[in-house]
């Protein structure tokens, strides 16, 4: 199935989904809507997965290494999209990452050590993704 069909399939079980094409454009795949997985790079496939998750319009979104297969610029674009979506849609977005440099964008940072929460810090002034470098 195409990238668009992949996202649309996931929306069949949702009460209040977002438009598949719109979300695919938001993740930078507006020109790849009708491409099949074999025609997409690993990073593009990851963005289809992110689009599928965002299009479901959940109250909580768990993102495990959302920038793992992405280049620096695309990774920042996706993090910015997640940050903006969190704010605009009042969605809780949990980002699990080994990249501690992106912690300043978070409202709250939970550091895990040996499978347990080692610390929990609230960030009163989250930084925009554009201002973060790694």
Place the predicted regions along the sequence by residue:
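ABC family nucleotide-binding domain
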Residues: 1-105, 111-112
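Short, flexible helix/strand-to-coil boundary loops that buttress conserved ligand/catalytic motifs
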Residues: 106-107, 121
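Conserved beta-strand-loop-alpha-helix hinge in the C-terminal portion
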Residues: 116-134
């Amino acid at each position: 199935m195409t990238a668009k069909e992949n996202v649309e399939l996931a929306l069949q079980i949702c009460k209040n989904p977002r438009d598949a094409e719109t979300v695919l454009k938001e993740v930078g795949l507006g020109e790849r809507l009708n491409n099949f997985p074999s025609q997409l790079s690993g990073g593009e496939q990851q963005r289809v997965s992110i689009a599928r998750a965002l299009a479901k319009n959940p109250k909580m979104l768990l993102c495990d290494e959302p920038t793992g297969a992405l280049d620096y610029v695309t990774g920042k674009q996706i993090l910015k999209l997640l940050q903006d979506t969190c704010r605009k849609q009042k969605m809780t977005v949990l980002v699990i990452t080994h990249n501690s440099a992106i912690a300043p964008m978070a409202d709250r940072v939970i550091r895990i050590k040996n499978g347990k929460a080692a610390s929990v810090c609230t960030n009163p002034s989250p930084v925009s993704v554009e201002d973060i470098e790694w």
